Amino acid sequence: MSNAYKRVLLKLSGEALMGDDAFGINRATIERMVADIAEVVGLGTQLAVVIGGGNIFRGVAGGAAGMDRATADYMGMLATMMNALALQDAMRHAGIVARVQSALRMDQVVEPYIRPRAIRQLEEGKVVIFAAGTGNPFFTTDTAAALRGSEVGAEVVLKATKVDGVYSADPKKDPSATRYATISFDEAISRNLQVMDATAFALCRDQKLPIRVFSINKPGALKRIVLGEDEGTLVHV
């Protein structure tokens, strides 16, 4: 079976790295994620990753109460850097060549984000991990995923979550909630379905960049998506 996508951008939340822990990075969880990523890389699909920082610090969370919002957001960006380095290290142990590019300069640790370099690295079969969000406060890492996905020419943004798609209602609260196999951007907006934050969602819609929402906890889900199988929910124009 041929790959459905040549180049994808995977959005990982920081919380996904916690596993069952209350905080930080769960090594077994990150190794399982990397095993899934290795399968996709082995198929020849070019993979970029945008990673969040919510397992360490969230600029909009309670820990930032009373703090200047921009300062809190910069702290969140530094948290994504820690996650990116952990992910790169786990990939190295799995035999995957990965590069971290940061929207904030930290030259002794990672490369700065340079679009042509990122594209070249993807073409060389390396995984490129984008850290520090957009490099600007007030923008989420979802927006960074939409931005970087558009910049490097990804064919789809794969948003890894704790649920296996977009539902008509919260499946934890409403047992009758149904999963959408596909849904348009406009329909998702009209139904007030929170796929991504408004800025990220609008950017994907304007760039005609589809979003595939899937469960990061479901073994093999990432590979099935790349092979074009029905997995999660596809949000399309």
Swiss-Prot record:
Enzyme nomenclature, EC number: 2.7.4.22
Keyword annotations from UniProtKB, A to Z: ATP-binding, Cytoplasm, Kinase, Nucleotide-binding, Pyrimidine biosynthesis, Transferase
Annotated binding of UMP, by residue: 53, 73, 134-141
SUPFAM superfamilies to which the protein is assigned, alphabetical: Carbamate kinase-like
A Pfam short name: AA_kinase
HAMAP family the record matches: PyrH_B
Record's protein name: Uridylate kinase
Organism listed in the record: Burkholderia ambifaria (strain ATCC BAA-244 / DSM 16087 / CCUG 44356 / LMG 19182 / AMMD) (Burkholderia cepacia (strain AMMD))
